[in-house]
Amino acid sequence: MSRWGKNIVVPLDSLCKEKENTNRPTVARSVGTVGKWGKMGFTSTRTYTLPAIHPMAAAAAAAAAAASPSQSPASTQDHDPNDLSVSVPEPPKPKKFFKSRNTAPPEVIAQIIQQLPHCGAGASPMRDHFSSAGAGAGGLTPTSGAQEAGGVKLKPGKGASSAERKRKSPKKKAATTSASTPSTPGAFYGASDRDGDGLSDPASEQPEQPSSASGKQKQKKPKEEKKLKPEAPPSRVLGRARKAVNYREVDEDERYPTPTKDLIIPKAGRQPAEVAATATLAAASSEAFISSTFGSPGSEPSLPPPTSAPSASASTSSQLPSASGSASNPPSASRTPEHPPIVLRISKGTSRLVSTDSEEPPSSSPAHQNQLNQLSVTEEEPAERSGDETVPASTPKITVKPLRPPTAADSVDGSSAAVGGASAGDSFEERKSQSLEPNEDEEEEEEEEDEEEEPPEINYCTVKISPDKPPKERLKLIIKTDVIRNAIAKAAAAAESRSEKKSRSKKHKHKQLLAAGSGAAPASGATPAEINSEFKTPSPHLALSEANSQQAQHTPSHLHQLHQLHPQRGSAVISPTTRSDHDFDSQSSVLGSISSKGNSTPQLLAQAVQEDSCVIRSRGSSVITSDLETSQHSSLVAPPSDIESRLESMMMTIDGAGTGAASAVPETPLQEDILAVLRGEVPRLNGNTDPEPTEEEDQQQQPKRATRGRGRKANNNVDVTPPATETRTRGRAKGADATTAAISPPTGKRNTRGTRGSRKAEQEVDMEVDETAMTTVPANEEQLEQATLPPRRGRNAAARANNNNLASVNNNINKIAANLSAKAEASRLAEGGVAGGAARSYGRKRKNQQVTQVLQQEPVPEEQETPDAEEEQPTPAKIPHTDHREHSPDHDPDPDPDELSNNSNNSSLQHDGSSSSPPPRDFKFKDKFKRTLTLDTQGAANAGAGGAAAAAPPESSGEQRGAVKLVISKKKGSIFKSRALVPSDQAEQATVAKRHLYKHSWDAALEANGGGTNSDASNASASGVGVAGAKDHLHHLAAGKSDGDFGDSPSSNNNGSSSACSSASTLRGDSPALGKISRLAGKQGVPATSTSSDAFDLDLEPIAGELDLERSAAGASAGGTGATTGGGGATGGGGPVRVDRKTKDYYPVVRNVKTAHQIQEIGEYQEMDDDVEYILDALQPHNPPATRCLSALQLAAKCMMPAFRMHVRAHGVVTKFFKALSDANKDLSLGLCTSAIMYILSQEGLNMDLDRDSLELMINLLEADGVGGSTETGHPDRAGYDRNKQKVRELCEEIKAQGKGTHLNVDSLTVGTLAMETLLSLTSKRAGEWFKEDLRKLGGLEHIIKTISDFCRPVIACDTEIDWQPTLLDNMQTVARCLRVLENVTQHNETNQRYMLTSGQGKAVETLCQLYRLCSRQIMLHPSDGGGSNKEHPGVAMRELLVPVLKVLINLTHTFNEAQPSLGAELLGQRGDVVETSFRLLLLSANYIPDQCVFELSILVLTLLINLCMHTVPNRAALMQAAAPAEYVADNPPAQGSVSALQALLEYFYKCEELARLVEKNTDAFLESNEKGKKKQEEVEETVNNLVQRAGHHMEHTLKGSYAAILVGNLIADNELYESVVRRQLRGNSFKEIIGVLEKYHTFMNLTSSLEAAFVAHMKSTKRIIDNFKKRDYIYEHSDEHDNPLPLNLETTAQVLAVGADASHAATSSTTVGSGSAPSSTSATGTTRAPRVYKTYSSHR
């Protein structure tokens, strides 16, 4: 909870999982429903099936679900059995939103990390950790081993999910943790480790269970996370994928085979410890562990080593998703978790994924332990089954697993695993439970009994019905406390026998683990076969597989050794279960279910529980529950984004460098390291494998750790695990000796967490140490308080403290504070005394995690960090921690540093995803690399240094931490920079705590952490997340670290161990080098967890790079582990671990947080989208008219907003609206509303979203007024119509107020007027060329022509003077707008032109001609030369109407084919009034209209005349015979009797030419006068302006004269008679002046016109006319030769002109008609030229 309290902000990232998986690895997914862009479910807790989950993730989820049956204890007390089945398992679907998360990125990252030097450095440690995890978890199918083996990266994702679920269902966390633990080694570890913090402490927590059994207990008791109903998921894969992936956002690996996530095996390991406490939990834990181990491809192979029974079953469940576990797959099937991992949410804000990974929960869930027990048939099945799990994996079994009383074996194992099992026991025991389930069951049962003694109240008997196959119909009988208590009583007895058996089996496993560690390193990584084959590359997978195989083979000896090494691991694994049963209601539901593993629900149940657990809200974490859960669910739903995965990987790498190592372990190098370590060749692995080697490693690493404070972490683990004295032993030797299994494994584990390689060694060592450390950390915290407490009791107390903190985090911050205080005291004791080391285990865990991260990443920094951590924590805890941690770091740095660089990054990542699939690793590495090249670069450089030397890796780690920080902040796809800022630990915390993010229990965390310096922020963050997550994290670190979950999500192991681990691994591990080292740090992050608080301080203060990386790696580790350690370390680590509040700056960082504007955009988009859907539904025809009218008005009102208009246009919704309203014309009221919508939408100058149906509706609405004719009298809803009309009027007035639609008369609104306004606003440019055709076909043209005719009839028919009323003027304005539409649709459209010309037998043309004449008369009757533009003036209205009339007439007379004269020219030419009216306008209009209007009108009239005579000979004759207007004759009395139109035209030409010359002369004079005197700049500018204006006037006159000349040229074309008539009217009988004007015009056009076809044709036509004039002049001048040459020339010229001009000018003519009226009426020969010129001019115009 303290994590939550402090880093509660982090959950935002989780909430924003869409961007950054890392931050919401576990929590993020469930917290942030942001997986999808616009959807962020912060408040609602949703169960998300994980359809998009990677198959591996799905398998892990299924396994988790199967293992999750531990959740079946009816969600302990508070959760309904039904609650667990929140999510229905669905087949794993590729995560759509964040595909990168799902697949390649992790592999890429893994590859990148592999390649990075830091990878090299970290790979070894990671590998060692994997080996240790594999060896330690091998028997148990430790997640890390499984991940190593299976390349369980995908499953680790589930692990994260499980961790998240744990968070979600803190109460179920215990039970769920068992379930969760199995789900994904990493995930389960993450879940279990978080549980481990909360659940891993189940042993101690169980005693505490009444108070709050675990950190989760807080949540668990108040509100046991509702156990997800064991809804039979289609497959374990589905459930696991579903929940695991989402929750395990950190676990990109789920989506992507990212080893880091799966590396969270320690969860599983821890769960075996739990299984000790609860056979069911242990079995589920083992199964889950196996499942988690094998949940991911890599993970499963790990299980096969323990393939005997648990491994196979866990592997199977895990394999279901990934089919990676070869041997395990069958068991997996049998225990296929059917529900996603259950996230137990701690009420304080820390939620644990009890079965975070539905896939992996089996490992820790009863199902998993059942599986393990069932699967123990293979190897440990007899032993494990001998516990509570008697049901064979193959046959459905109903196992009632009562909590087991601690047995001698358990206590034996518990001595090492109880001390370690108390703190590390959780995670280690869980893990051991998986690896050494018999022993661990005993240990766990001892722990559990100790814990049970306290919380017997929640003794849930999980009746786990495990069919031979993991049937989806798994029955999960959850017996509430009464039954469970009885079951617990039975479990006590059964636990003794089972614990003995499990002790055997765990010892067997442990031996196997040891064998795997020493000789089975290759096997540990994968199923024995897979591992062995993989072992060719000394891959941790091989190590795990070998370890598992050896565990299977050497169950007695190796199991014993492993039990010694991993007894804590197993105990821890079981311990969480045990504690879960009692301590965690939530966990009890899940882990309690697992605790009552004896009869724990089968994997199926566990799976179902886990799936449901997604929805489960931890009782205590109501605050976070809804939002965070929703986010979690959302996380489940949306796979973590690539960036998130990378961030997670990076964070895990940084935070869980060990995690990364574990993930990387799958790589051969890691396996080699692991093998070496397991064999004792590599101290790290040896630490895990052999108690002495562990001690050696511890001692070897101890100096480093001591210097770096990693030892502290180890010490914390060791302290708890062994006597404080041993724990205090700086070297792991003491801790390993005293608690070889307990202390050494925790150390290894912590180291593992610190670094992946280290994590490997620590997987074995830390497995034990984590169990021990987890047990010990809690025990340390409590043992520190009660130095003399039995390890388990200390663990129980510590677990209580941790679990209470976990549970209390959910349930009570006070509990957290108490637990933290207890842990702090324990830490102090460990620091100061025998238990001091143990207590330190917690406090150190964080520091050591950081230190370990740094250590393994950079041995020197680690040493430095270790001293810091040691300084923070007393030397005793510090030293043992350091020893253990350093032991792992020695292994990690020495063998694994290079491999870490190469493999730890790659391999650890790969291990996460799949031991057998480096590509998953590559994805992770890719993600890491993608997330931050900076981190990669730093990590690579650091890793290079670190890889070079053992010390170098720690340095690299330190550097990488800085880089990691950057990585986190600079997540590649991350929208939220803040995520990157969160340290890996915190990232994990954030991921875990994200659910509780909003609870921000700083104070509670601080109280709990009391003396935790770094623990303040880290503890608050890590206390909320750390107390709940601390134990869980310690356990998770132990289990996860040991199993590789640490490596996966050091931080995730804490909070959503797999989630945070994935987060760390993804975040930190994302950076290939950095990620690995970070992951190693994450593994070492177990100690680094304790160091993490320190590391946070260190990060905050000591080194920017180290600070970043350390904060990132250790931060993730410390944040997650450190959060755990902060919570646990604060509790256990006490004062030294406390983080200053200033560190809070880092903790509140929320990852995946959207910026304000993004939230706003998403909200606005969603709001508009919802509005559209709502309105669209209400507009459908099946609704009543009143409803449709109301919705239409609502839509119209919304369309007033530009943003909404843009939205509906952008998404093409407009046509959907009109389609729904297609029958609106049948109802007057609805039609009015519809036309209002159209009108409003048309007021923008944007293209209309029209289709044929919408246009048809618009045209139907034009005539809708008739339908409503009865409106006045008998409209059925007159009142409604009036109401709607008023609303429409208000909208229209608002539009007019905006300056639009000024011509609309709002007082006379009708359906037709609005529709017409809409139609008239359309143009082909806006609506498209199709508009011209459809408008004609749909009757729009006909309606427009009819409207014009109707409006003009009263005016045209009036013989007397017209009384222009406002209504008539309004009608004329409407006619003008209709004519503009006609002009638009007839331009360059011959079909529409012919339609208009033939419409109504020529009535349209007749109406136009009458209107033309009317305008001409009215202009002269009502002069408007005042320049005013008052539209109420009849002259102004008619003048404005005349322009569109002329343009329509010009279009109608345009000739498309010169060979075929224009039909319009013929029809209009037959009406004499057209030519007469045209000459009147041309010659007289200048006297009645403003000067600025004369030019346009003159050009249009000349263009019309040119079109009439260009190709139509009859029209030429009409023009030649036409007489000038009488008014013109009166003004210009003729010398002779009459004046012809031709004479008037020529005079007009000379007048224009003279005016042009005059203007030109004035301009020249003006220029000369200006040149005489010097002008100021202002005067020069004024002169230029004047010249421009004068030049404009000059060209206006020139253009008018030119058009007149073109008209003359067309008249005389091919007609000598007309030529002679014209020549007589010319000055000097010569065309020279005409030629001069035309040449000037031609030059002007040539310079200014574009190269469009119309202009080019016009230019050619003009040139022909000029040439014709010249020839005619030449012929005339040579009159003597006139007879012969002239006809020839004329003929030739005419032919040439005709051919060229007819062809090109025909097109030009009609084109020009629109612009000008010059060339149209030239005579025959000239006609060809003139028309073109005219056309061109017209077009040019």
Curated annotation (Swiss-Prot):
<comment type="similarity">
    <text>Belongs to the WAPL family.</text>
</comment>
<feature type="compositionally biased region" description="Acidic residues">
    <location>
        <begin position="860"/>
        <end position="873"/>
    </location>
</feature>
<feature type="compositionally biased region" description="Low complexity">
    <location>
        <begin position="939"/>
        <end position="952"/>
    </location>
</feature>
<feature type="compositionally biased region" description="Polar residues">
    <location>
        <begin position="367"/>
        <end position="377"/>
    </location>
</feature>
<feature type="compositionally biased region" description="Low complexity">
    <location>
        <begin position="515"/>
        <end position="529"/>
    </location>
</feature>
<feature type="region of interest" description="Disordered">
    <location>
        <begin position="1112"/>
        <end position="1141"/>
    </location>
</feature>
<feature type="compositionally biased region" description="Acidic residues">
    <location>
        <begin position="438"/>
        <end position="456"/>
    </location>
</feature>
<feature type="compositionally biased region" description="Low complexity">
    <location>
        <begin position="553"/>
        <end position="568"/>
    </location>
</feature>
<protein>
    <recommendedName>
        <fullName>Protein wings apart-like</fullName>
    </recommendedName>
</protein>
<dbReference type="InterPro" id="IPR022771">
    <property type="entry name" value="WAPL_C"/>
</dbReference>
<dbReference type="GO" id="GO:0000785">
    <property type="term" value="C:chromatin"/>
</dbReference>
<feature type="domain" description="WAPL">
    <location>
        <begin position="1140"/>
        <end position="1648"/>
    </location>
</feature>
<feature type="region of interest" description="Disordered">
    <location>
        <begin position="68"/>
        <end position="100"/>
    </location>
</feature>
<feature type="region of interest" description="Disordered">
    <location>
        <begin position="490"/>
        <end position="612"/>
    </location>
</feature>
<dbReference type="InterPro" id="IPR011989">
    <property type="entry name" value="ARM-like"/>
</dbReference>
<dbReference type="GO" id="GO:0007059">
    <property type="term" value="P:chromosome segregation"/>
</dbReference>
<feature type="compositionally biased region" description="Low complexity">
    <location>
        <begin position="175"/>
        <end position="185"/>
    </location>
</feature>
<dbReference type="InterPro" id="IPR039874">
    <property type="entry name" value="WAPL"/>
</dbReference>
<feature type="compositionally biased region" description="Polar residues">
    <location>
        <begin position="586"/>
        <end position="604"/>
    </location>
</feature>
<feature type="compositionally biased region" description="Low complexity">
    <location>
        <begin position="1708"/>
        <end position="1730"/>
    </location>
</feature>
<feature type="compositionally biased region" description="Basic and acidic residues">
    <location>
        <begin position="880"/>
        <end position="894"/>
    </location>
</feature>
<feature type="modified residue" description="Phosphothreonine">
    <location>
        <position position="258"/>
    </location>
</feature>
<feature type="compositionally biased region" description="Gly residues">
    <location>
        <begin position="1117"/>
        <end position="1136"/>
    </location>
</feature>
<dbReference type="GO" id="GO:0007062">
    <property type="term" value="P:sister chromatid cohesion"/>
</dbReference>
<feature type="modified residue" description="Phosphoserine">
    <location>
        <position position="355"/>
    </location>
</feature>
<dbReference type="GO" id="GO:0005634">
    <property type="term" value="C:nucleus"/>
</dbReference>
<keyword id="KW-0159">Chromosome partition</keyword>
<keyword id="KW-0469">Meiosis</keyword>
<dbReference type="Pfam" id="PF07814">
    <property type="entry name" value="WAPL"/>
</dbReference>
<feature type="compositionally biased region" description="Low complexity">
    <location>
        <begin position="796"/>
        <end position="810"/>
    </location>
</feature>
<feature type="region of interest" description="Disordered">
    <location>
        <begin position="1708"/>
        <end position="1741"/>
    </location>
</feature>
<feature type="compositionally biased region" description="Low complexity">
    <location>
        <begin position="309"/>
        <end position="334"/>
    </location>
</feature>
<feature type="compositionally biased region" description="Low complexity">
    <location>
        <begin position="408"/>
        <end position="426"/>
    </location>
</feature>
<feature type="region of interest" description="Disordered">
    <location>
        <begin position="823"/>
        <end position="963"/>
    </location>
</feature>
<keyword id="KW-0597">Phosphoprotein</keyword>
<feature type="compositionally biased region" description="Basic residues">
    <location>
        <begin position="165"/>
        <end position="174"/>
    </location>
</feature>
<feature type="compositionally biased region" description="Low complexity">
    <location>
        <begin position="849"/>
        <end position="859"/>
    </location>
</feature>
<feature type="compositionally biased region" description="Basic residues">
    <location>
        <begin position="503"/>
        <end position="512"/>
    </location>
</feature>
<dbReference type="GO" id="GO:0140670">
    <property type="term" value="F:cohesin unloader activity"/>
</dbReference>
<dbReference type="InterPro" id="IPR016024">
    <property type="entry name" value="ARM-type_fold"/>
</dbReference>
<feature type="region of interest" description="Disordered">
    <location>
        <begin position="675"/>
        <end position="810"/>
    </location>
</feature>
<feature type="region of interest" description="Disordered">
    <location>
        <begin position="1038"/>
        <end position="1068"/>
    </location>
</feature>
